[in-house]
């Protein structure tokens, strides 16, 4: 690591020869495998952009020039070259973020970890440079599947309209996002191979060459192997130049000298220009290259030599969903699945293997996925759209106007709901229950354990006249939490010890074990409580109001924003029913949460059993008249 440790900032790269740059690239790959294997993170994408990142920082002068990263999980090499080489606590509290972070460095312009948005940013920043007469360069790096998102093409449409506004767009073409990239864009890069004229040319050439003695067949095989290079050279150029964009490439994304030459040409061009780079996701790391599913897109802690996980965490929420989907697919031919370029991460790999003709990967295009789901439902099928909770935010209009308005039977399965922790602000699924509360007819299920995931998924797909949502957490699923009774459609998890109990605890989803712990802590203080799991948190069960009326205080506990969440819905429901019982809602405050473990984040925001029990004890004491108010002392001079 002799060269890497000498890099304190991008300008240190200027002193290195091409041979030293190649050595630096190797050192960076070795560093990444070693560091990320200890912490987990996005390994494959970063192994693929080493030379590209080196070239970018040699040609452009960050932070004066703005280098913007779409799907910021590709920014590890960028961090290393801008003075951030302590990866020992990557994605952990107090350590480096797994994405660009303004708090870390002036070299990080946008904290972007949702795909396809960077070209909009770049368009705006280039316009600002024009208005303010600044000669800074704006460089947007997009790829790893992000060009399957509609936002990128909306931005390109605007960018292409200004022929004399400088903007460099680097397309990192690794043919993959989380998995092999799908859709028309990927197919376009293969268009030349399947055109009639091209095939006739190949057939004629093959016939002539195979009749040529000695050298004919070997020469044909050599030329046949060049098809991909010819195809990649011609097809993308036509696509981008038809939009009115200058095109440079394709460039070998692992040839630093070629990359620098192309980027220098783009830098001098006084208008929008595409630099098309061909890279290999997972480059230099055999376990990643052998992983056909996703090239080690994101990994947990692994053995660096083998790439095998160091430990397994047991049954996880995603796997429970995936296995139940296969069973539902076997029972019902109308069940189909949708994923937005995340087949394996959302647990649909086994469903695809069992029913390859009943799964649709729409690319990084959640809006289209939701609208397509409405069409599938209208056509007589029941689509299950599995997506990370944070990414459904992008499709709100389609959920509202395409699915709900048309009473379509579509089930949205929200993985990574609640606090996800180490991926930081952009990946916490903490807004879905607030955003979706206002959607008419939509129903939301929040299962508390594996059994409830299975049961409530089945209940959801049985609804054919309205959208349903099933949300669950990230990671390992805990032991079953058994109900001791029922109230309407709700499960009673704990009965009170007193005839007139003090507190009704409304437990949402995976927080059931914590709510039972809260009840134990309250019981130790002589406070009797009931714990109820609504199961379906929208709409609020009609049986909740009479149950609440038999208690002195209602407490809601959810892993969602308090603003407009389940607590707000329960409060409104009680008001509508004329139940005048004090309610205290516990959840996530309306702030962006920094990266840390789930437990650390929950402790920081006070969403723990001891914190909640302490506050509820104080509330009950106040109702009892045991609260001692303290007079505010006057300020002293």
Curated annotation (Swiss-Prot):
PROSITE patterns, A to Z: TRANSKETOLASE_1, TRANSKETOLASE_2
Keyword DNA damage in record: no
Enzyme class: transferase
Any one of the GO CC terms: cytosol
Cofactor notes: Binds 1 Mg(2+) ion per subunit. Binds 1 thiamine pyrophosphate per subunit.
Reactions it catalyzes: D-glyceraldehyde 3-phosphate + pyruvate + H(+) = 1-deoxy-D-xylulose 5-phosphate + CO2
GO terms classed as biological process: 1-deoxy-D-xylulose 5-phosphate biosynthetic process; isopentenyl diphosphate biosynthetic process, methylerythritol 4-phosphate pathway; terpenoid biosynthetic process; thiamine biosynthetic process
This enzyme's EC code(s): 2.2.1.7
Chain positions recorded as Mg(2+) binding sites: 144, 174
Similarity comment text for this entry: Belongs to the transketolase family. DXPS subfamily.
Listed name of the protein: 1-deoxy-D-xylulose-5-phosphate synthase
Taxonomic lineage: Bacteria, Bacillati, Actinomycetota, Actinomycetes, Kitasatosporales
């Amino acid at each position: 690591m002799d060269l890497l440790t000498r890099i304190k900032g991008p300008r240190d790269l200027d002193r290195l020869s091409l041979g030293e740059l190649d050595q630096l690239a190797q050192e960076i790959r070795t560093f990444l495998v070693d560091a990320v294997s200890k912490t987990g993170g996005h390994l494959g994408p970063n192994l693929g952009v080493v030379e590209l990142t080196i070239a970018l920082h040699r040609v452009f002068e960050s932070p004066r020039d703005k280098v913007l990263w779409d799907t910021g999980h590709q920014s590890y090499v960028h961090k290393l070259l801008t003075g951030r080489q302590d990866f020992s606590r990557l994605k952990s509290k107090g350590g480096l973020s797994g994405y660009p972070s303004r708090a870390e460095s002036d070299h990080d312009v946008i904290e972007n970890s949702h795909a396809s948005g960077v070209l909009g940013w770049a368009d705006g920043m280039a316009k600002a440079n024009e208005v303010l007469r600044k000669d800074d360069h704006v460089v947007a790096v997009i790829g790893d599947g992000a060009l399957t998102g509609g936002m990128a093409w909306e931005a390109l449409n605007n960018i292409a309209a200004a022929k004399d506004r400088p903007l460099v767009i680097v397309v990192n073409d690794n043919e993959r996002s989380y998995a092999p990239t799908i859709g028309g864009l990927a197919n376009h890069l293969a268009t030349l191979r399947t055109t009639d004229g091209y095939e006739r040319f190949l057939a004629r050439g093959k016939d002539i060459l195979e009749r040529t003695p000695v050298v004919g067949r070997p020469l044909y095989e050599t030329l046949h192997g060049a098809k991909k290079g010819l195809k990649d050279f011609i097809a993308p150029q036509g696509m981008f130049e038809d939009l009115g964009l200058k095109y440079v490439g394709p460039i070998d994304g692992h040839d630093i000298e070629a990359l620098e030459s192309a980027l220098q040409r783009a830098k001098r061009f006084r208008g929008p220009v595409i630099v098309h780079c061909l890279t290999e996701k997972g480059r230099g790391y055999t376990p990643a290259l052998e992983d056909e599913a996703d090239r080690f897109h994101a990994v947990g802690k692994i053995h660096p030599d083998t790439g095998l996980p160091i430990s397994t965490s047991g049954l996880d929420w995603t796997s429970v969903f995936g296995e139940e989907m296969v069973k539902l697919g076997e029972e019902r031919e109308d069940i189909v699945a949708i994923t937005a370029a995340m087949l394996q991460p959302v647990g649909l790999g086994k469903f695809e293997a069992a029913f390859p003709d009943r799964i649709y990967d729409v690319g990084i295009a959640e809006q289209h996925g939701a609208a397509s789901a409405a069409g599938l439902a209208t056509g007589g099928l029941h689509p299950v759209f599995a997506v990370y909770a944070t990414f459904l935010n992008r499709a709100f209009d389609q959920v509202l106007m395409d699915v709900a308005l048309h009473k379509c039977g579509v089930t949205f399965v929200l993985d990574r709901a609640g606090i996800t922790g180490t991926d930081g602000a952009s990946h916490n699924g903490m807004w879905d229950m607030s955003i979706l509360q206002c959607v008419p007819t939509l129903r939301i299920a929040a299962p508390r354990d594996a059994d409830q995931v299975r049961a409530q998924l089945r209940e959801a797909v049985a609804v054919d006249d309205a959208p349903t949502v099933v949300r669950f957490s990230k990671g390992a699923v805990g032991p079953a939490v058994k109900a001791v009774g029922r109230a309407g459609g709700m499960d009673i998890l704990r009965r009170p010890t007193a005839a007139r109990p003090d507190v009704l605890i409304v437990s949402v989803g995976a927080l059931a074990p914590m709510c039972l712990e809260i009840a134990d802590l309250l019981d130790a203080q002589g406070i009797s409580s009931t714990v109820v799991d609504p199961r379906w948190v929208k709409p609020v069960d009609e049986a909740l109001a009479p149950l609440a009326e038999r208690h002195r205080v209602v407490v809601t506990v959810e892993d969602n924003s308090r603003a407009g969440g389940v607590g707000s819905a329960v409060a409104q429901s009680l008001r509508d029913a004329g139940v005048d019982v004090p309610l205290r809602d516990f959840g996530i405050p309306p702030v962006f949460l920094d990266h840390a473990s789930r437990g650390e984040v929950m402790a920081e925001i006070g969403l723990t059993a001891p914190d909640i029990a302490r506050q509820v004890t104080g509330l009950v004491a106040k109702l009892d008249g045991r609260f001692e108010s303290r007079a505010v002392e006057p300020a002293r001079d």
